[in-house]
């Protein structure tokens, strides 16, 4: 067969889309077309920040039906989403309550309990995963302690992409790359860790053994009656994005830039040394037995909140105004946990500057400048940490995802990090999702083969560092952890 048509359902924390890929195996050309885009936002339910899971499912099905109604024969479907959040099911496979968002404050104070009762080094030795206050391990502990009546109804817990696959196929699956984000998977066995799971109060029977990407979960029956295989892709959206990152060699790092920024490198081994623990480095699962050695950064979430609060709709105009301002007048630590979900983001940024005896950003452009400069400097700080961890410097940084369209931030990143930046592709998560589907369909050999297809079909933009830039001169002075409470500490 010359042509393959694969559908990627790509859900982010702020939006979702259903994308159709067309792959010509003879010429190795790959094109994407957006079929359906929809909003994903938090809602308050009984005092919790929850996801409107039924609305998301409705939009997924609508997007799939739109493809089928075009008369296109779909070869496969794959679903990727953000990590750590889950859906609870009862014995009949029906949903129990609404899934609570990782941004809800129910986990406040939970992580410190684990550090005392299990031990930080012991948790890291078992999982290899960074300490984030909203990891699934702490969410489940909050659930079982705060909502025992709800907990008593639970028979299964599915992570977000696995839930939507279940709704399409009727088959349950626990995909490995996303499962590792829970901080509950043992890094040596690739199975759920008994000690960590027992501490949460959740039952091991809620979970099946994690499966690596590339297996067929089951079939979705389209309106026309065709059975379409649903593939377990690398269902954590960052895992998919890394698959589509055209990393040139072992000296290349990646930055998946969106609501979250995730900076790291690909490795055949995990890094769980005392140095890695001190730097709060995570070893999330990747495709083909590779590890995504990385660190979470609070990313463009800060900007997204400012845009919403101040009703800014013309982002290109804002960036142009921002570029005209002097650099590094206002600096914050984007990973300060005060920015996870404040009531008023721009007021929180202003307060952080005021508390550190800096000028206070007032205008929209000044707030954006503060965010961009601070992110670029934090990128440089973390890239330095990663290089020290592996004992080799990086020579190139690949920025993928929606944030790679921000030319100003890309250049600031190149200047601060002091290395060449390659930006693109934008639709990295979708492409990585498609890549695993094509491998499952035996159209591609492996991840490296797929990256060659990506490089041949998608243009990258190069940014050369300017060592004389204002931000480059501030790198040595920027110490984000000195005056703030780190999100990942």
From Swiss-Prot:
CDD domains (UniProt xref): ASKHA_NBD_FGGY_RhaB-like
What is its cofactor? Mg(2+)
**Annotated binding of substrate, by residue:** 83, 236-238, 296
**Binding-site list for ATP:** 13-17, 259, 304, 402
Name the enzyme group at the top EC level.
transferase
Q: What does the entry give for GO biological process?
A: glycerol metabolic process; rhamnose catabolic process
SUPFAM superfamilies attached to this UniProt entry? Actin-like ATPase domain
Q: Where is the active site?
A: 237 (proton acceptor)
Pathway(s) the chain acts in: Carbohydrate degradation; L-rhamnose degradation; glycerone phosphate from L-rhamnose: step 2/3
**What reactions does this protein catalyze?**
L-rhamnulose + ATP = L-rhamnulose 1-phosphate + ADP + H(+)
Q: Which Pfam families does the UniProt record give? A: FGGY_C, FGGY_N
The record's listing under InterPro entries reads: ATPase_NBD (IPR043129), FGGY_C (IPR018485), FGGY_N (IPR018484), Rhamnulokinase (IPR013449)
Please list the disulfide bridges: 68-222, 353-370, 413-417
Example GO molecular function: ATP binding
Protein EC: 2.7.1.5
Taxonomically, the superkingdom here is: Bacteria
Q: Which UniProt keywords apply?
A: ATP-binding, Disulfide bond, Kinase, Magnesium, Nucleotide-binding, Rhamnose metabolism, Transferase
General function of this protein:
Involved in the catabolism of L-rhamnose (6-deoxy-L-mannose). Catalyzes the transfer of the gamma-phosphate group from ATP to the 1-hydroxyl group of L-rhamnulose to yield L-rhamnulose 1-phosphate.
Which family is this protein grouped under? Belongs to the rhamnulokinase family.
Q: What is this protein called?
A: Rhamnulokinase
Organism this protein belongs to: Salmonella newport (strain SL254)
Q: Which gene encodes it?
A: rhaB
């Amino acid at each position: 067969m010359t042509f393959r048509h694969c559908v990627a359902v790509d859900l982010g924390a702020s939006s979702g889309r259903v994308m159709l890929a067309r792959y010509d195996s003879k010429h190795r050309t790959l094109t994407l077309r957006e079929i359906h885009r929809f909003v994903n936002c938090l809602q308050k339910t009984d005092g919790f920040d929850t996801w409107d899971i039924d609305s998301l499912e409705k939009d997924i099905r609508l997007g799939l039906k739109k493809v089928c109604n075009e008369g296109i024969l779909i070869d496969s479907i794959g679903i990727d989403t953000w990590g750590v959040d889950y859906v609870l099911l009862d014995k009949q496979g029906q949903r129990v309550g609404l899934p609570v968002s990782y941004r809800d404050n129910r986990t406040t104070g939970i992580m410190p309990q684990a550090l005392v009762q299990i031990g930080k080094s012991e948790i890291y030795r078992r999982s290899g995963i960074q300490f984030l206050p909203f990891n699934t391990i702490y969410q489940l502990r909050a659930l079982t302690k705060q909502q025992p009546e709800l907990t008593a109804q639970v028979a299964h817990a599915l992570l977000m992409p696995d839930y939507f696959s279940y709704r399409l196929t009727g088959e349950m699956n626990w995909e490995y790359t996303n499962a590792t984000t829970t901080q509950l998977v043992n890094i040596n066995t690739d199975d759920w860790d008994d000690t960590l799971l027992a501490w949460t109060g959740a039952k091991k029977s809620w979970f099946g053994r994690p499966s690596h990407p590339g297996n067929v979960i089951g079939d979705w029956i389209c309106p026309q009656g065709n059975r379409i295989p649903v593939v377990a892709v690398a269902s954590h959206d960052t895992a998919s994005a890394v698959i589509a990152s055209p990393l040139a060699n072992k000296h290349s790092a990646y930055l998946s830039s969106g609501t979250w920024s995730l900076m790291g490198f690909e490795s055949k081994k995990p890094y769980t040394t005392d140095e890695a623990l001190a730097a709060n480095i995570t070893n999330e699962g990747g495709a083909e037995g590779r590890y995504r050695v990385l660190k979470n950064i609070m990313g463009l979430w800060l900007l997204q909140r400012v845009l919403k609060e101040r009703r800014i709709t013309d982002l290109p105009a804002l960036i142009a105004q921002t570029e005209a301002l002097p650099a590094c007048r206002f600096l914050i630590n984007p990973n300060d946990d005060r920015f996870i979900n404040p009531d008023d983001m721009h007021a929180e940024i202003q307060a952080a500057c005021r508390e550190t005896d800096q000028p206070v950003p007032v205008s929209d452009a000044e707030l954006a400048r503060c965010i961009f400069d601070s992110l670029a400097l934090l990128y440089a700080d973390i890239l330095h940490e990663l290089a020290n961890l592996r004992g080799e410097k990086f020579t190139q940084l690949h920025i993928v995802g929606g944030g790679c369209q921000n030319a100003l931030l890309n250049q600031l990143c190149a200047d601060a990090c002091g290395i060449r930046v390659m930006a693109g592709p934008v639709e990295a998560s979708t492409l990585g999702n498609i890549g695993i589907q094509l491998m499952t369909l035996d159209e591609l050999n492996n991840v490296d083969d797929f990256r060659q297809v990506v490089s041949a079909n998608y243009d990258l933009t190069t940014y050369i560092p300017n060592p004389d830039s204002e931000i480059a001169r501030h790198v040595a002075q920027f110490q984000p952890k000195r005056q703030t409470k780190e999100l990942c500490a």
